[in-house]
């Protein structure tokens, strides 16, 4: 360890953190964590399977929901290897190249999820504001084009991350703050000038903030449209179609905002709190989104139950 921490030796291996102070209980902590990953993967896989196999769900809203499920699957699978290696096998080491690759996929799928939530907010606005032209505007081809464009946009946005991190020198510390690699966490360990990473990281965070602002704008327009509907029953019916999406937005953005505030203003907070919040960031959205959409979306719920009943028969 003395060689690794020497300032004259460039670091090529990082050490991730499990639960600080609870290392003795990692094997027991792995049980709920592995269960959450399993439920998230099965839940999002089920959403994708139901939408693919049910022709009646081949509509814009459900295509966008399948995009959300794919981004959730990507988030889960990106962090899964290091989390399992720490809690199951007590192996916190990760090579620098593997770390840079992991942070690319984690940030890429996070940006993609933010983009999908933005698309879904405009989808809900269009469905409520102009229902007669909804299907003619959002055709299958146009939905596919939107999905491809936003996927490329998400990956291109984070593509510089691993290359800028790779150009930095790491020669003092090699202990990261989480169970997986994040851009802002890795760049803090650099002993060379990391201003480019700081600026580009801020730009990436700004893009997420723009998505959030546009989602808020779309819901302001939705609320304005709903208030213009004469019937209270129709107002509630229109708003009810947005509940699942609003829950998904809160579940995704709230942990990001909390973690950003902690990193920026509460630097002396307990490392355990830091790790817990970071794990919530990647575990909770993929875990809860399928549950929320199955519970609140009748079309999904009915078909999931029907598939389960068929298997029992």
Curated annotation (Swiss-Prot):
SUPFAM superfamilies: Family A G protein-coupled receptor-like (SSF81321). One of its GO terms (molecular function) is olfactory receptor activity. Residues 1-27, 78-101, 163-198, 260-274 are extracellular. Its main location: membrane. One of its GO terms (cellular component) is plasma membrane. Residues 49-56, 123-141, 219-238, 296-313 are cytoplasmic. SMART domains: 7TM_GPCR_Srsx (SM01381). Keywords: Cell membrane, Disulfide bond, G-protein coupled receptor, Glycoprotein, Membrane, Olfaction, Receptor, Sensory transduction, Transducer, Transmembrane, Transmembrane helix. Disulfide bonds join 99-191. InterPro entries: GPCR_Rhodpsn (IPR000276), GPCR_Rhodpsn_7TM (IPR017452), Olfact_rcpt (IPR000725), OR51/52/56-like (IPR050402). Glycans are attached at residue 5. Gene3D superfamilies: Rhodopsin 7-helix transmembrane proteins (1.20.1070.10). It holds the Pfam family 7tm_4. It is found in: Cell membrane. The keyword Nucleotide-binding does not apply. It is a multi-pass membrane protein. The keyword Signal does not apply. The chain crosses the membrane at residues 28-48, 57-77, 102-122, 142-162, 199-218, 239-259, 275-295. Odorant receptor. Belongs to the G-protein coupled receptor 1 family. This is Olfactory receptor 51A4. The lineage of its organism: Eukaryota, Metazoa, Chordata, Craniata, Vertebrata.
């Amino acid at each position: 360890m003395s060689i690794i921490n020497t300032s004259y030796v460039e670091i090529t291996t990082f050490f991730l953190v499990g639960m600080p102070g609870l290392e003795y209980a990692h094997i027991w902590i792995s049980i709920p964590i592995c269960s959450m990953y399993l439920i998230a993967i099965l839940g999002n896989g089920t959403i994708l399977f139901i939408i693919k196999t049910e022709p009646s769900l081949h509509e814009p809203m459900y295509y966008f929901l399948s995009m959300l499920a794919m981004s959730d699957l990507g988030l889960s699978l990106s962090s899964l290897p290091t989390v399992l290696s720490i809690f199951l096998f007590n192996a916190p080491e990760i090579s620098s190249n593997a770390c840079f690759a992991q942070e690319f996929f984690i940030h890429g799928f996070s940006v993609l999820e933010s983009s999908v939530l933005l698309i879904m907010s405009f989808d809900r606005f269009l469905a409520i504001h102009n229902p007669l032209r909804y299907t003619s505007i959002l055709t299958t081809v146009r939905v596919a084009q939107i999905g491809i464009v936003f996927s490329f946009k998400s990956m291109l946005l984070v593509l510089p991350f691993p290359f800028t991190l790779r150009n930095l020198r790491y020669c003092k510390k090699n202990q990261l703050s989480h169970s997986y690699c994040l851009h802002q966490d890795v760049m803090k360990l650099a002993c060379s000038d990391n201003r480019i990473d700081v600026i580009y990281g801020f730009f990436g965070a700004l893009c997420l903030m723009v998505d959030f602002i546009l989602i808020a704008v779309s819901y302001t327009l939705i609320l304005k449209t709903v208030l213009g509907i004469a019937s209270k029953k129709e107002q509630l019916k229109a708003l009810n179609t947005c509940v699942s999406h609003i829950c998904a937005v809160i579940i995704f953005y709230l942990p990001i905002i909390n973690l950003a505030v902690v990193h920026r203003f509460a630097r002396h907070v307990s490392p355990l709190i830091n790790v817990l919040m970071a794990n919530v960031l990647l575990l909770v959205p993929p875990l809860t989104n399928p549950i929320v959409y199955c519970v609140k979306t009748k079309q999904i719920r009915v078909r999931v139950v029907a598939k389960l009943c068929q298997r029992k028969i």
